[in-house]
Amino acid sequence: MSPSKVYQTPEEKIRAELGLSSGVLTIRRNAPAAVLYEDALAERKTAISSTGALIAYSGEKTGRSPKDKRIVDEPTSSDNIWWGPVNRKASEKTWLINRERAADFLRTREHLYIVDAYAGWDPRYRIKIRIVCCRAYHALFMTNMLIRPTEEELAEFGEPDFTVWNAGQFPANTHTEGMSSKTTVEINFRAMEMVILGTEYAGEMKKGIFTVMFYLMPINHNVLTLHSSANQGPNNDVTLFFGLSGTGKTTLSADQHRKLIGDDEHCWSDYGVFNIEGGCYAKCIGLSGEKEPEIFNAIKYGSVLENVVYDPVTRVVDYEDSSITENTRCAYPIEYIPSAQIPCLSENHPSNIVLLTCDASGVLPPVSRLTPEQVMYHFISGYTSKMAGTEQGVTEPEATFSSCFGQPFLALHPMKYATMLAEKMSQHNASAWLINTGWTGSSYTAGGKRCPLKYTRAILDSIHDGTLAQAEYETLPVFGLSIPKAVEGVPAELLNPAKNWVEGEGKYASAVSALASKFTENFKIYQDQATEEVVRAGPQI
């Protein structure tokens, strides 16, 4: 793929790989924010917000395109990949066509941007990433999201371990073998490259690298990659938070009393926990300074706001406006969070594992303590609710399951990650909890109430100070979950959903049965590889 010749600079190498003569276009490597702002403002719908953040528009695609994710079927990785709906196969011929198509487009641009940076804060495991793109906003986004090298590290950067070719403004050819749309996000583990066509959504770069880490870390280093946030308390106790979008993973890990290790992507090694990223990618819908001050105040010069609506006169962002997308986002360096732990790693192993779910059925309790087998079951299940209202005709929230709380990003079979997690929890004596940040008293559609954030934070405080581990518990039928009878700062009537159900315990039993059936049906695809103890840890109808 790449010429064997040794080049003096990364810019020279990129010119050679794209077949460009010297001076045909401008290549900016690791450009500062000010330069990227200047270039970005030439693009349509780009502006500077009242707080100094760069406002950018990602075009037609305002979210990831998981059905267009491809992994090249090649001999060095094929036997390890979890093939199926998550990881669709692309032939090596298709890869070559798409890579050349991306190169053809990139060589026509006026400016190209290179971002050389790292994935992984632990120097023992970090990999060198090179981003090649043609939108300044993409370059600033990845400058924020990757770990920025020092001047000395950049001078000695050398060859990257993995390269992303982002030609997202240009579509894939739908007549190419294996293409189902004009979008493709394609990873080749033999070439150690990724190609993006047909989507300008910046999150595709971030999550593509996440998939690479989900493959390389377990396979090459026996290091567990996790879709989680992490923080560390004053006593050096580490907590991991697992949860799908909208469950509160980013919000709850940003705690003024604890140091933030990271908000989304981590690895758990024999030496502790480290963040994969150098930034945060927070959801902005409904954001306010009162509810989430650390995130709100991080939106300033150097940050990237994506697909938000703003007042064209004052440039004040309306975080309640979802007319472009519900998936409004902001990407900022992790140093913008005052409580961030820099470097973003801990030599301490997690003492608490928190599985977050936003249960719109109202069935699951605000908090329950999990056995090791229940952790395996609920980690593999990865349950939450996809909320109604974002699609025409959808009137009921939908139960959704995402194995390991990160199914779209997994490279290996979920049981591989679940087994590694169970082994590490056992080795380091970690406690595990299931927290429902969703509805209580009834379902979303039948008058239930969202569990207030202040109560969820009180629950976390009781986990971190050790009092919840010493509490008295009762068992929730069917799911077999252990529920505390009292938590300081939380009304006792909220803790047991059966006793709190507005329509009475009889109606609650019906709701439990309905949700339990969905869990059981979902788990069937993993049952043949799970132990009998793990299967029994699920709901018993």
Curated annotation (Swiss-Prot):
UniProt entry keywords in alphabetical sequence: ATP-binding, Decarboxylase, Gluconeogenesis, Lyase, Nucleotide-binding
EC number: 4.1.1.49
InterPro entries cross-referenced by the UniProt entry: PEP_carboxykinase_ATP, PEP_carboxykinase_C, PEP_carboxykinase_N, PEPCK_ATP_CS
Superkingdom classification of source: Eukaryota
Catalytic activity: oxaloacetate + ATP = phosphoenolpyruvate + ADP + CO2
Pathway the protein acts in: Carbohydrate biosynthesis; gluconeogenesis
One cellular component term from this protein's GO annotations in UniProt: cytosol
Main enzyme class: lyase
Residues bound to ATP: 243-250
GO biological process, one term: gluconeogenesis
Family indicated by similarity: Belongs to the phosphoenolpyruvate carboxykinase (ATP) family.
HAMAP family in alphabetical order: PEPCK_ATP (MF_00453)
Protein name: Phosphoenolpyruvate carboxykinase (ATP)
Species of the source: Eremothecium gossypii (strain ATCC 10895 / CBS 109.51 / FGSC 9923 / NRRL Y-1056) (Yeast)
